């Protein structure tokens, strides 16, 4: 939505708008991940942190994410210098996959995939459903928005 509110020629944002208007779901990657042994994953259409919270709550686990490892396109960082982190963490409509598996399973997926995979954090014991996001200095970020919630209609 924030992209649609801007001049699309501004900073060459047309490629990002095209990706928003014509999403390419990662169906092949999903099948590849399943065949490699990934047993937990979902799309990130409702926001990375919000969707990761759903996975953690359903699994009885917690997650820690490193902001610096989240692959936010340079164009988004340029267009939204003060808000790119929130967009990357809670923006949604990315239609990328969030996969949860042991490192060796994800490495096997990465070897066979044309889509680059990025490890953004770890999942383990902790308060079920809690997602902690840390900046480059290790400080915890406090997010006002976690993502879209279809049940209450709020982001």
Where are these regions (language model features)?
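Glycine-/charge-enriched secondary-structure boundary and capping motifs
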Residues: 12-15, 35-155
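Short, acidic (Asp/Glu-rich) active-site segment that either coordinates a divalent metal cofactor
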Residues: 1-31
């Amino acid at each position: 939505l924030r992209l649609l509110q801007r001049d699309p020629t501004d900073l060459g944002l047309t490629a990002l708008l095209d990706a928003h208007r014509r999403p390419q779901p990662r169906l092949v990657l999903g099948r590849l991940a399943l065949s490699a042994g990934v047993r937990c994953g979902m799309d990130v259409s409702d926001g990375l942190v919000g969707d990761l919270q759903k996975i953690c709550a359903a699994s009885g686990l917690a997650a820690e994410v490193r902001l610096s490892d989240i692959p936010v396109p340079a164009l988004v960082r340029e267009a939204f210098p003060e808000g790119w982190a929130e967009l990357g963490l809670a923006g949604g409509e990315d239609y990328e996959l969030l996969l949860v598996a042991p490192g060796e399973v994800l490495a096997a997926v990465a070897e066979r995939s044309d889509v680059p995979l990025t490890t953004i954090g770890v999942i383990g014991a902790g308060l079920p459903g809690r997602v902690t996001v840390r900046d480059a200095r290790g400080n915890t970020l406090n997010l006002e928005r976690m993502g879209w919630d279809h049940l209450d209609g709020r982001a």
